[in-house]
Amino acid sequence: MSEQLVTPENVTTKDGKINLLDLNRQQMREFFKDLGEKTFRADQVMKWMYHYCCDNFDEMTDINKVLRGKLKEVAEIRAPEVVEEQRSSDGTIKWAIAVGDQRVETVYIPEDDRATLCVSSQVGCALECKFCSTAQQGFNRNLRVSEIIGQVWRAAKIVGAAKVTGQRPITNVVMMGMGEPLLNLNNVVPAMEIMLDDFGFGLSKRRVTLSTSGVVPALDKLGDMIDVALAISLHAPNDEIRDEIVPINKKYNIETFLAAVRRYLEKSNANQGRVTIEYVMLDHVNDGTEHAHQLAELLKDTPCKINLIPWNPFPDAPYGRSSNSRIDRFSKVLMSYGFTTIVRKTRGDDIDAACGQLAGDVIDRTKRTLRKRMQGEAIDIKAV
């Protein structure tokens, strides 16, 4: 269980009210104790907040009027607002969500048997992966708990209101939007706790996935804080290529990264013994059959399934998209070694909502010193 105290950074209004979306259940119970109330009131309010997407205390009919009045004086339920919506021809929806004076992007991906929400963890990204649009926008700041879980809350409210249109409720959440989640563990972990909590969104730990590019110290801490499904952004079969396209590899190389992954798998039940490998296919960079053989050798001791991701272009990018024939040959080599290999279907590329295309609106792109410091750091992570 993570611990994040209710501090001034949780105060979101000029009147000094606490945003209850910033609190996991443990913190919510402490909040109600401080109000002189029984802790079960926290569970009641959380159920209203997350099961019914309710942000109005007056609508919480099993809460007495006196307590509702007290809550209105000291607290609020404020999710970030959607400022723009784009709908793809394939049913994918991308929302631009206002966080202060910036925007992040959240993507809803419906399928026949599920609906996945891709959630952002930072405004921009500090890791500067060369093939990713988000990285080219620079880095501004970490998102708070309310800004992370608020993306899920806002999407659930929109989708819930649209049930008559047949939109599927959210069944899966992937921390694969803007940012590196492991560089924001103090906010990402409490948000994921709310996703898993029965009084929160009640998702299975196998249906909440965190994706990382390889912040090794933070990955080791993650396993002591929460158990969720893990995906790793590998994208290269050797250090030479990965140093170039995923610069954090210069600090934590592939061998070090995969060793940390195996340590996480030993602790985790959510992953059922194997990790998901994400591998973006860049034309004549990492997509040759020789690269496939190298990748198979590299992963022989790491139980995994492999997702091959056709690269999604963005303006001024230095790469090209691998042809279907090159992807097919690459996939067949991996399968010949016995790896479960899936070529990910591109979704939402007509609205720039596909993998690697999220950019948001990062107002301050000048924080290069902070960005460099954050590369490879697990900053001020608390675990209890």
UniProtKB/Swiss-Prot annotation:
Binding site for [4Fe-4S] cluster: 125, 129, 132
GO cellular component, one term: cytoplasm
Disulfide-linked positions: 118-355
Active-site residue numbers: 105, 355
Cofactor binding, per record: Binds 1 [4Fe-4S] cluster. The cluster is coordinated with 3 cysteines and an exchangeable S-adenosyl-L-methionine.
InterPro entries: Aldolase_TIM, Methyltransferase_A, RlmN_N, RNA_MTrfase_RlmN, rRNA_lsu_MTrfase_RlmN/Cfr, rSAM
A Pfam family it matches: RlmN_N
Reactions it catalyzes: adenosine(2503) in 23S rRNA + 2 reduced [2Fe-2S]-[ferredoxin] + 2 S-adenosyl-L-methionine = 2-methyladenosine(2503) in 23S rRNA + 5'-deoxyadenosine + L-methionine + 2 oxidized [2Fe-2S]-[ferredoxin] + S-adenosyl-L-homocysteine; adenosine(37) in tRNA + 2 reduced [2Fe-2S]-[ferredoxin] + 2 S-adenosyl-L-methionine = 2-methyladenosine(37) in tRNA + 5'-deoxyadenosine + L-methionine + 2 oxidized [2Fe-2S]-[ferredoxin] + S-adenosyl-L-homocysteine
Keywords: 4Fe-4S, Cytoplasm, Disulfide bond, Iron, Iron-sulfur, Metal-binding, Methyltransferase, rRNA processing, S-adenosyl-L-methionine, Transferase, tRNA processing
EC number: 2.1.1.192
Gene3D superfamilies: 1.10.150.530, Aldolase class I
Residues reported in the UniProt entry to bind S-adenosyl-L-methionine: 179-180, 211, 233-235, 312
Top-tier EC class: transferase
Similarity section: Belongs to the radical SAM superfamily. RlmN family.
Function (record text): Specifically methylates position 2 of adenine 2503 in 23S rRNA and position 2 of adenine 37 in tRNAs. m2A2503 modification seems to play a crucial role in the proofreading step occurring at the peptidyl transferase center and thus would serve to optimize ribosomal fidelity.
Protein name per UniProt: Dual-specificity RNA methyltransferase RlmN
Annotated source species: Shigella flexneri
